[in-house]
Regions:
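Bacterial N-terminal signal peptides
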Residues: 8-18
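Sec/Tat signal peptide C-region and signal peptidase I cleavage site
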Residues: 20-23
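Hydrophobic small-molecule pocket/channel-lining residues, especially in calycin-type beta-barrels
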Residues: 25-177
Length: 177
């Protein structure tokens, strides 16, 4: 009986190892959404720069952190201030989406568009919370431009009454470690 049990255990272990080995040879399929999400993960760390005007705009700090076992990238804008905002980037049903927790008290959601490239992620409004209609003021679109590994520009389009009324721009550089 012990021999049969040991043989069965060894056979089960061998079968499991064979399955793992077979899968290990497969390359995970990559999608534009997954590639873009991986690019966001590379932003991890502290970034400093300007909001508004590249030279004279107000100082801005942004912290990027990968969280939730690698399934979410958290962007904290103006950390520790009364105007602190958080944007969470994550994959949902194979699409890269974001939820922006705005100082205005609403939470617009956006999805990566087909216009996105490896150097520029383009997001557009798909809904949100505390926004009763598209006429309510909210962030409606966002673009992140990667300039090498240590520079980033982002633009956030604000919509009011169904049309774009402002674009918030950020010019950031990675804090040296």
């Amino acid at each position: 009986m012990k021999t049969i049990f040991r043989f069965g255990s060894v056979l089960l272990l061998a079968l499991c190892l064979a399955c793992v080995s077979a899968r290990g040879g497969e390359k995970a399929s990559s999608t534009p959404a997954q590639d873009a999400f991986n690019k966001l993960k590379e932003l991890a760390g502290e970034w400093h720069g300007r909001a508004g005007d590249r030279e004279k705009g107000m100082e801005a700090t942004v912290i990027y952190k990968t969280t939730a076992a690698g399934n979410t990238v958290m962007e904290t804008l103006f950390p520790g201030t009364t105007h602190e905002m958080v944007t969470m980037y994550y994959l949902e049903d194979g699409k890269l989406v974001l939820t922006h927790y705005c100082a205005a008290g609403n939470q617009p959601r956006m999805a990566l568009t087909k216009k996105a490239t490896p150097e520029m992620l383009d997001f557009n409004f798909i809904g949100g919370a505390n926004i009763s209609s598209r006429r309510d003021g909210h962030m409606h679109a966002a673009r992140l431009r990667f300039i090498g590994k240590d520079a980033l520009e982002s633009e956030w389009d604000y919509f009011q009454d169904g049309k774009k009324t402002d674009t918030k721009k950020f010019y950031l550089k990675r804090k040296a470690s």
